[in-house]
């Protein structure tokens, strides 16, 4: 499973959206995620990929592509 597919699966689980709504360009705001949703999403990504994402980096992750790129660069 690719990083994108794993991230997409986590977004679907965390935000309760349909998988076909998610592309690399999809922002979390597009999916009606509030700040708490985003914190929980970042925590789920950290757990899945065994990463520690500092707050200053988490603030830069605004869409699915940002998350995928961050994970690929820091794994």
Swiss-Prot record:
Stretch forming the signal peptide: none
InterPro entries, sorted: ACP, ACP-like_sf, PKS_PP-bd, PP-bd_ACP, Ppantetheine_attach_site
O-(pantetheine 4'-phosphoryl)serine modified-residue sites: 35
A molecular function GO annotation: acyl carrier activity
GO cellular component assignments: cytosol; membrane
Subcellular location: Cytoplasm
GO BP of this protein: lipid A biosynthetic process
S-S bonds: none
Ranges of residues in domain Carrier: 1-75
Pathway entry: Lipid metabolism; fatty acid biosynthesis
TM annotation in the entry: none
SUPFAM superfamilies with a match to the protein in the record: ACP-like
Domain of life where this protein originates: Bacteria
PTM entry text: 4'-phosphopantetheine is transferred from CoA to a specific serine of apo-ACP by AcpS. This modification is essential for activity because fatty acids are bound in thioester linkage to the sulfhydryl of the prosthetic group.
NCBIfam families per UniProt: acyl_carrier, PRK00982.1-2, PRK00982.1-4, PRK00982.1-5
Family under the similarity heading: Belongs to the acyl carrier protein (ACP) family.
Function recorded in the entry: Carrier of the growing fatty acid chain in fatty acid biosynthesis.
UniProt name for this protein: Acyl carrier protein
